[in-house]
Amino acid sequence: MDGFQEVDAEYEDRMRTFESDCNGGKGNAVACHQVGEYLSVVKNDFDKAGRIFEANCNTRNHAPSCFNLGRFLLAGKGLPQSDAQAEKVFDSACAKDHQPACLHLGFMHLYGGEGFQRDIKKAIEVLDTSCSGGLADSCNMLAKQLLRHDGKGPVPRDPPRARGLLEKGCSHNHGPSCFNLTVMLKKGDEGVPSDYQKYREYREKTESLAAQLQGIDGNKQA
């Protein structure tokens, strides 16, 4: 127990240092962001955290704070709910190569929201860029849209392109991307012939990742 108390004391000391470095929003942007994280995650004081993220985003354009601000605005946590404002700050963070912000921005433009103009072309661009930047969730999200069979997807079906995206996602050890690639290569799809050797290869990788993560969120073996 003493060990936990010592860690907690050290953490509190570190946070006091960040508060000092932040200097009421006039100091270091990284320090201010850490104070916001502390208030949100540890203290559950979403009102204060939201104000800090808002100031750090609006005055410093600090991408991680803009991303957190966007999530708060989407959820109406600590700040009034606003899809339009969330889209704006996600766009700002994405422009500074914050890949999770690009993922959220792409999702919003795929499905739309209140107070902003849905832009499918922009959704595809930011998800593709985010995928290339190494965020496997973006690879998988865009690939799933390109594989929809119901005719209601926001983008036309394109299995070959989807395969490339899933391969990128799987190369980053993203279990869902590997799983979806396994299914595609077992069954084949338009422009993507079945490939038993590749299917076995990706199935083994999926199973290995699943074992490491104790399962991949309800996915079953292909």
Q: Model regions: which residues?
A:
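Eukaryotic tandem repeat interaction scaffolds
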Residues: Q99-K152, P159-L166
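Canonical positions in the second alpha-helix
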Residues: D21, A55-N56, S92-A93, T129-S130, ...
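Structural signature of tandem alpha-helical TPR/SEL1-like repeats
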Residues: D8-R16, N44-I52, P80-V89, F116-V126, ...
